Swiss-Prot record:
Lineage of producing organism: Bacteria, Pseudomonadati, Chlamydiota, Chlamydiia, Chlamydiales
Name of the featured protein: Chorismate synthase
Listed Pfam families: Chorismate_synt
Species in which this protein is naturally found: Chlamydia felis (strain Fe/C-56)
Cofactor stoichiometry and binding remark: Reduced FMN (FMNH(2)).
One CC-aspect GO term: cytosol
Amino acid sequence: MRNRFGCLFSLTTWGESHGPSIGLVIDGCPAGLPLSLEDFVPVMLRRSPGRLGTSQRKEADIVHILSGVYQGKTTGTPIALQIFNTDIDSETYRKQDDRYRPGHGQFAYEKKYGIVDPLGGGRSSARETACRVAAGVVAAKLLAHYDIYCLAFLSKLGKESIKEYPQFTHEFAQSVYSSPFLSPLASDTITKQLMDLQKEKDSLGGVVSFITSPIHESLGEPIFYKVQAVLASALMSIPAAKGFEIGLGFASADKYGSEYIDPFIFEEGKISMSSNNCGGSLGGITMGMPLNGRVAFKPTSSIKQPRLTVMKTGEPTVYSTPKEGRHDPCVAIRAVGVVEAMVNLVLADLLLQQRCSRL
């Protein structure tokens, strides 16, 4: 089983949903980067459960630095971080351990490995993404040193979506971070949809978009490691992710070449483009434009309606999520921080690779 992501700036995560703790090791972070416990607090809060539209499992998600930092700066050695699980309720899973949970990876996991930890989803639980968000904090600090910034936000919930694609500004980022749903969509509209979901005992899918500041570093390679290829791999590894696109994405298929091509222009002493249909990547390499893309998330499989399934012995039966079960009615809300983290991790890794690509 592979638990490592990245090449030069790499992340390894460990732990299960209902284990004592989860954690991660970052390898390849340069020495001298300022890093403190306070850096993690606001970012971890944006992913944390316990609010409307998210799981009612209340985890503090306090990050503990075990190694790799001395006197407030990274030392260049592996950075080990640990997050304790403090709000675990395994009994609801043990009660129905004799049957498979519809829509979850438990059956496939057990078929592949012959053994599975079913409590809270075990290793395949979205709980693991807290580690990615913590790692994203370190990656974001490295990128900020090179004036590269990324923002993710909820751009579509069910049939409600943003009308225009925004540009990255720090002011827009602050407005997203101050929203309870990390979205430019109207909070009262989202609240109504989520309240309706609770009444209907159902769940809803969504889309998380990301935008970056202009990236003047040449990140990515022209063949197998195009920036969009690495982003796709990273973002599609997030639990419940079902689709990825960059720039116009699938809408590109509806365009004529004369409509799609981004014209080059010379502006303020440098070559740029007058549009960004490509999403910030030409030939798989960034070239001064902002990156932008979207990730589609399926509706959460854990809904409080009875669903058809089978016993582990093969007999037909029903799986019912207990009333006390704690699950996200819309996983896309908490996925916002995970998308932002994974984009930051990809860009940090490609940035270090770019430093090695030429004299």
